[in-house]
Structure formats: structure tokens, C-alpha cells
């Protein structure tokens, strides 16, 4: 293998590992951080409303116990 071919292979390996590591840094579901935060806020509001109802809170302590 010539020096030029070795250098080309080196660049291809570096490029491939950079692309793979860059893709792994993003959310796995393909949504951006703002969408993930919005979904998290919606879930928190739903649980908050659910746990504020005494019959739901006492019927599902595994969901609402963290609030005590």
C-alpha cells in the first residue's frame, strides 16, 4: 500500500468515526430538545393533575408517592 492510499484510508476512518459519534449525541427518537422538553412538561402536568385527585392518588400510590 502506498503512502497516499494509507492516508486516504486514515481519513475515511476518521470521517466514519466522527459521523457515528455525532449521530449518537442526538436524541434517539429524532426529535429536538425543545420537543422533548415540551413532552416532558405535558407529562408532568398530567401527573400533577392526576395526583391532585384523592381517589386517583390513593388508588395508584406507585405513581403519586414521590410527591409526599
Curated annotation (Swiss-Prot):
GO terms for molecular function: acetylcholine receptor inhibitor activity; ion channel regulator activity; toxin activity. InterPro entries: Conotoxin_a-typ (IPR009958). Keywords: Acetylcholine receptor inhibiting toxin, Disulfide bond, Ion channel impairing toxin, Neurotoxin, Postsynaptic neurotoxin, Secreted, Signal, Toxin. Residues 1-21 form the signal peptide. Expressed by the venom duct. Disulfide bonds join 51-64. It holds the Pfam family Toxin_8. Residues 22-48 form a propeptide. It is found in: Secreted. GO terms for cellular component: extracellular region; host cell postsynaptic membrane. Alpha-conotoxins act on postsynaptic membranes, they bind to the nicotinic acetylcholine receptors (nAChR) and thus inhibit them. Belongs to the conotoxin A superfamily. The cysteine framework is C-C-C. This is Putative alpha-conotoxin Qc alphaL-2. It comes from Conus quercinus (Oak cone). The lineage of its organism: Eukaryota, Metazoa, Spiralia, Lophotrochozoa, Mollusca.
Amino acid at each position: 500500500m502506498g503512502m497516499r492510499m494509507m492516508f486516504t484510508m486514515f481519513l475515511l476512518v476518521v470521517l466514519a468515526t466522527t459521523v457515528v459519534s455525532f449521530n449518537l449525541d442526538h436524541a434517539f427518537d429524532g426529535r429536538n430538545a425543545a420537543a422533548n422538553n415540551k413532552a416532558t412538561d405535558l407529562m408532568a402536568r398530567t401527573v400533577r393533575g392526576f395526583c391532585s385527585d384523592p381517589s386517583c392518588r390513593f388508588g395508584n400510590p406507585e405513581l403519586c408517592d414521590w410527591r409526599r
